[in-house]
A protein has these predicted regions:
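N-terminal glycine-rich anion-binding loop in soluble enzyme alpha/beta folds
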Residues: 4-64
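Local beta-strand N-terminus motif with an aromatic residue
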Residues: 3-4, 77
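Glycine-rich phosphate- or other oxyanion-binding loops that anchor nucleotides, phosphorylated ligands
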Residues: 50-98, 140
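Mixed-charge interfacial surface used for oligomerization/domain docking
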Residues: 3, 11-25, 30-32, 92-108, ...
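Short N-terminal secondary-structure initiator segments
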Residues: 37-65, 117-139, 206
Length: 262
């Protein structure tokens, strides 16, 4: 019997509850604040950043992936599908590929042209394919296909180290082709929220996922979701946790969207 284990890393923003439900193994992205390992809560992390702490992340070691792959093998898996963010901005998939060469279980490593919760959505699509009887290759292709249907828009007000900048401007960004590009800059978060909503609706989305980093931005995310909920089939919510928030800073919120049919 063929049993495929599905793996990713914590930058996919798959919550522990969702990972357990999907049966997905998640390798943590190491996070530090002021050069010390951080293991606290998401709210505590952003509170420290607002106080001036410098946040950094590092790539999980190949050994961390080897441990995960071998654990999957010990649980009865005969192969592994390991799905990660864009290799153009992170070495995570390269570390996973190095680990794959050190294990006896076959591992397919996929680097997607998306980041953050976009990766999580693709992991979910691969999981659905596997549960439907797909092979590793077919599930990998499905994850890659879904990645091409996704679009995104977000605000990330951060200075070096993810600290909060001194200015009050809110620049709307979009991640594509391995980089984040500024679309427009606004004087208030309310104005940025309205413009983001209009851009999303112009994309004729079927489904939308809205997320936020610091608790202070939850209201902005709520406003964005409210602007969209009557025009789309569903609006999901997610939290930007430290593995991504170390780069965006606490003043960040945004959305991914895709056709209802995907």
């Amino acid at each position: 019997m063929t049993l495929v284990a599905l793996c990713t890393d914590s930058s996919s923003l798959i919550s522990p509850a969702a990972a357990a439900e999907l049966g997905v193994e998640v390798v943590p992205i190491p996070v530090t604040l002021d050069h010390e390992k951080f293991d606290g809560t998401t709210d505590g992390f952003y509170a420290r950043m607002r106080q001036g702490a410098v946040a950094t992340t590092s790539v999980p070691s190949p050994g961390a992936f080897v441990e995960m792959y071998e654990r999957a093998q010990g649980g009865g898996a005969t192969s592994v599908l390991s799905i990660h963010l864009d290799r153009r901005i992170s070495g995570v998939s390269e570390s996973a590929a190095l680990a794959a060469r050190e294990t006896t279980i076959p591992v397919r490593v996929v680097s997607l042209p998306t980041v953050s919760y976009g990766v999580g959505l693709c992991v979910r699509a691969a999981c659905a394919a596997l549960r439907g009887g797909a092979t590793v290759s077919t599930a990998a292709v499905e994850a890659e296909r879904v990645a091409t249907t996704l679009d995104n828009v977000f605000v990330a007000r951060s200075a070096p180290g993810g600290r909060v900048p001194a200015d009050d401007e809110w620049t709307i960004l979009r991640f594509a082709a391995g980089e984040a590009t500024g679309l427009s800059t606004h004087a208030t978060v309310e104005e940025a929220t309205a413009i983001m909503g209009r851009r999303i609706l112009r994309g004729r989305p079927g489904l939308v996922a809205v997320g936020h980093a610091g608790a202070e931005l939850e209201a902005a995310a709520d406003g964005l979701a409210h602007d969209l909920v009557e025009a789309v089939a569903a609006v999901e919510r997610y939290r930007v946790t430290p593995s991504v928030g170390a780069h965006t800073g606490p003043d960040s919120f945004g959305a991914f969207w895709w056709p209802a049919s995907r």
